[in-house]
């Protein structure tokens, strides 16, 4: 599909689970997307955030908490926070 400027745009861009890399389908109503804010040295929000998407499968298995912790520890090392 094309917009008014002639650029090709997609109507639907599927998300992928951050923990398992599974595609999150439109019918997965148990999936969540979580934004985690970055803090400066004083503990104040600096306007940046990281987004994680978890599928309903991960949440149903009870692995959401450990997956989110693992993903954040990895990301925190990347951004040196």
Curated annotation (Swiss-Prot):
Keywords: Ribonucleoprotein, Ribosomal protein. GO terms for biological process: endonucleolytic cleavage in ITS1 to separate SSU-rRNA from 5.8S rRNA and LSU-rRNA from tricistronic rRNA transcript (SSU-rRNA, 5.8S rRNA, LSU-rRNA); endonucleolytic cleavage to generate mature 3'-end of SSU-rRNA from (SSU-rRNA, 5.8S rRNA, LSU-rRNA); translation. InterPro entries: Ribosomal_eS21 (IPR001931), Ribosomal_eS21_CS (IPR018279), Ribosomal_eS21_sf (IPR038579). GO terms for cellular component: cytosolic small ribosomal subunit. Pfam families: Ribosomal_S21e. PROSITE patterns: RIBOSOMAL_S21E. GO terms for molecular function: structural constituent of ribosome. Belongs to the eukaryotic ribosomal protein eS21 family. This is Small ribosomal subunit protein eS21. It comes from Zea mays. The lineage of its organism: Eukaryota, Viridiplantae, Streptophyta, Embryophyta, Tracheophyta. The gene is RPS21.
């Amino acid at each position: 599909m094309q917009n008014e400027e002639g650029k090709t745009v997609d109507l639907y861009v599927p998300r992928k689970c951050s923990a398992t890399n599974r595609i999150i389908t439109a019918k997965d109503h148990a999936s969540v997307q979580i934004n985690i804010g970055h803090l400066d040295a004083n503990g104040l929000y600096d306007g940046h955030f990281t987004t994680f998407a978890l599928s309903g499968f991960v949440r149903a298995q009870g692995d959401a908490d450990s997956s989110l912790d693992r993903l954040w520890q990895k990301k925190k090392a990347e951004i040196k926070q």
